[in-house]
Amino acid sequence: MLLWPAPAKLNLFLHIIGRREDGYHLLQTAFQFVDYCDWLEFRPSADGRIEHLSPLPGVPVEHDLVYRAALLLQQRTACSQGVEVRIRKHLPMGGGLGGGSSDAATTLVALNHLWETGLSISQLAQLGLELGADVPVFIYGRAAWAEGVGEQLQPLELPEPWYLIVTPAVQVSTREVFIAPELTRDCKPMTISGLLAGEGENVCEPVVRGLYPVVADALDWLSQFSPARMTGTGSSIFAAFDGKSQALAALACMPSHWQGIVAKGCNYSLLLDCLEKTGC
């Protein structure tokens, strides 16, 4: 049995540089993966039924991104096969680590292989974009500079530090953050060279600090050890360390009511490694 990884991502910075006519925010960000994942198991079937055996509590199956990804691939390729899907869920919900998008991307990539539907990675990414702006970066599996609504991607080679990722016990509403009047929406455009020089910030962070004091507390705590930043709209935050031992030492001091993990930054996701092992 092969388990397929759905890795977490970090937004190393997040700027908003404007808005489109349809109201969507124009973003700049940089994605890097870590070696911490959900794990998905797929059992193809001949009956054409898509069965999600690990549904998320309170989420109707037709709204679940894994189910929607499988159905989308099945319909667009006129595939007659079905599948049973199980998920070993590790990534927190509403944490800004991309768990739902990553699960959807892994579903598209894995079923394209198992069902032998023959789509290219770029074709899968186009399908993924229909499910969410973050899905394509997980399909390509490369650390990337992103613009537009997050779908315009340019591969990046970045340092791969150890991270301590802390998730307070709260789910942040992305909608609440993006409609906040105090959110900065006119950042000066960033450059890749600026990112590599350490420039950039997460402009959602001040808004989330005000709305969710527990996230502010976590940021202040983690900043004692290394500069801390929020990923996406939170609630997860992270800090980089030169070595695993330093990250583990900070984790040992973390308040017990938060969730913390130590993970390695990866410019190539574990999903790419898995795909290579299948011979694709």
UniProtKB/Swiss-Prot annotation:
Cystine pairs: none
Gene3D superfamilies found in the cross-reference section: 3.30.230.10, GHMP kinase, C-terminal domain
Single GO molecular function: ATP binding
Active-site residue numbers: K9, D134
Catalytic activity: 4-CDP-2-C-methyl-D-erythritol + ATP = 4-CDP-2-C-methyl-D-erythritol 2-phosphate + ADP + H(+)
Gene Ontology terms: biological process: isopentenyl diphosphate biosynthetic process, methylerythritol 4-phosphate pathway; terpenoid biosynthetic process
EC number: 2.7.1.148
The keyword Kinase appears for this protein: yes
Purpose: Catalyzes the phosphorylation of the position 2 hydroxy group of 4-diphosphocytidyl-2C-methyl-D-erythritol.
UniProt record similarity statement: Belongs to the GHMP kinase family. IspE subfamily.
Family matches, as HAMAP family: IspE (MF_00061)
Protein name, per record: 4-diphosphocytidyl-2-C-methyl-D-erythritol kinase
Organism: Nitrosococcus oceani (strain ATCC 19707 / BCRC 17464 / JCM 30415 / NCIMB 11848 / C-107)
Gene name of the record: ispE
